[in-house]
């Protein structure tokens, strides 16, 4: 229901801004908005088309793991933690393994693996759903974990900084790690409070402290490396782990006497079906965002925030990076464009350039994830998913600003 109102608001606000723009002499404003609808529709289809092959690959690999029993082993291993965080999912259910694969892929920055495993997890949770058009508590918790975007290796951002000539491309690594950790913990706490999950249970507290310790070790380890070594290690480690997962699943299937090839084909067929399912949802959300942006409403919001901050007497250095923060929940490619624009205009080593990179890495594309994940299982009533996801994003934004001032202010 919340998504419904937000989608309507995109068009209403865009029309109001277009009328104001026309009154002020901009005769091309309506054409820009209409053009954006066609561009966004085409972009949505191209995204779905691009996902088809990746979905086929990873759903095929997941099917091998499922038949080989690997997913069940992961589910049993993670059951003590996930049964506390997802109390409505039966103990040792295979979805636990899919959730782990998705979270692990996100942490390693392996987007190509994260989306298919995430969609697989949604399909498995939908099998447990009594109301097929309504999101369940486990679905919402899972979505919030995705939208908070916990990433240990932000490879793409580091590569962009290097290409723009940053003196030290990896200097945003630790700030991104800290900001995304805050966003993830905030998402878990907010959703747990909403769903009345007791986060003070020993298992959950131990897991949270363990996550913090793990991140601390990663920060310390990378802190001992120069930028070239760090870039090499992150690239090699990410791809080696990805290939290792594929090989482990295939070998597990072989030793369990599974017909690995047939299992892969069976799973891959689901990839095409899933890709087709999400097209309408992607078109809807990307067109809504497109008209909102083309109308100039986004620019007005940013200017309004800048003016408000300055009137309050606060340091407004961060405002130049806000377009990336505001765009990130709406569009990943849009936020990436804002980040690159900030580095181009202000410089990659400027405060704004660095903060825009931290914004880009601290959270994920909330509305895109909601559209794709819920769309894949035809969920229409998203309940508190949008609110929890955006609150986690907001926590990540505030954390990013504070951390940027601590490191680079």
What are these regions (language model features)?
Residues 1, 50, 89, 94-96, ...:
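Residue-level detector of functional hotspots within protein domains
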Residues 1-53, 159-292, 311-312, 384-409:
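Signature of multi-pass transmembrane helix bundles
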Residues 5, 32, 44, 60, ...:
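Hydrophobic alpha-helical context, especially transmembrane and signal-peptide helices
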Residues 24, 85-89, 127-132, 164:
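Alpha-helix termini
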Residues 30-127, 256-345:
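Membrane-embedded alpha-helical segments and adjacent helix-loop junctions characteristic
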Residues 100, 104, 139, 230-233, ...:
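Generic signal for short, ordered secondary-structure residues
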Residues 113-114, 121-160, 166-196, 322-409:
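C-terminal transmembrane helix pair
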């Amino acid at each position: 229901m919340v998504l419904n109102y937000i989608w309507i608001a995109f068009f209403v606000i865009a029309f109001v801004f277009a009328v104001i723009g026309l009154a002020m002499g901009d005769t091309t404003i309506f054409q820009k908005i209409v053009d954006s609808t066609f561009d966004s529709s085409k972009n949505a289809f191209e995204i779905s088309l691009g996902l088809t092959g990746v979905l086929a690959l990873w759903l095929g690999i997941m099917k091998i793991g499922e038949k080989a029993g690997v997913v069940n082993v992961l589910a049993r291993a993670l059951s003590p933690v996930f049964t506390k965080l997802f109390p409505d999912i039966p103990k040792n259910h295979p979805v636990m393994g899919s959730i782990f694969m998705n979270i692990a892929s996100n942490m390693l920055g392996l987007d190509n693996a994260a989306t298919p495993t995430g969609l697989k997890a949604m399909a498995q949770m939908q099998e447990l759903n009594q109301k097929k058009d309504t999101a369940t508590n486990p679905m919402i918790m899972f979505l919030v974990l995705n939208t908070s975007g916990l990433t240990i290796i932000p490879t793409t951002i580091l590569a962009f900084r290097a290409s723009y000539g940053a003196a030290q491309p990896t200097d945003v690594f630790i700030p991104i790690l800290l900001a995304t950790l805050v966003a993830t913990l905030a998402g878990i706490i907010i959703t747990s409070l909403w769903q009345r999950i007791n986060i003070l249970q020993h298992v959950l507290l131990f897991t949270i402290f363990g996550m913090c310790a793990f991140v601390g070790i990663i920060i310390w380890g990378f802190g001992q490396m120069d930028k070239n070594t760090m870039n090499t290690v992150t690239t090699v480690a990410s791809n080696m782990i990805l290939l290792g997962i594929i090989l482990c699943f295939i070998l597990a299937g072989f030793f369990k006497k599974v017909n690995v090839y047939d299992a892969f084909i069976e799973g891959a067929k689901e990839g095409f079906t899933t890709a087709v399912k999400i097209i309408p949802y992607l078109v809807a959300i990307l067109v809504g965002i497109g008209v909102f942006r083309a109308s100039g409403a986004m620019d007005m919001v940013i200017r309004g925030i800048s003016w408000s901050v300055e009137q309050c007497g606060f340091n407004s250095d961060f405002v130049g990076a806000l377009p990336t923060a505001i765009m990130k929940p709406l569009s990943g490619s849009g936020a990436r464009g804002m980040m690159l624009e900030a580095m181009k205009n202000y410089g990659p080593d400027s405060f704004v350039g660095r903060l825009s990179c931290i914004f880009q890495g601290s959270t994920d594309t909330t509305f895109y994830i909601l559209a794709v994940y819920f769309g894949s299982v035809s969920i229409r009533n998203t309940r508190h998913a949008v609110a929890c996801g955006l609150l986690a994003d907001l926590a990540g934004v505030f954390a990013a600003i504070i951390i940027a001032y601590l490191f680079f202010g």
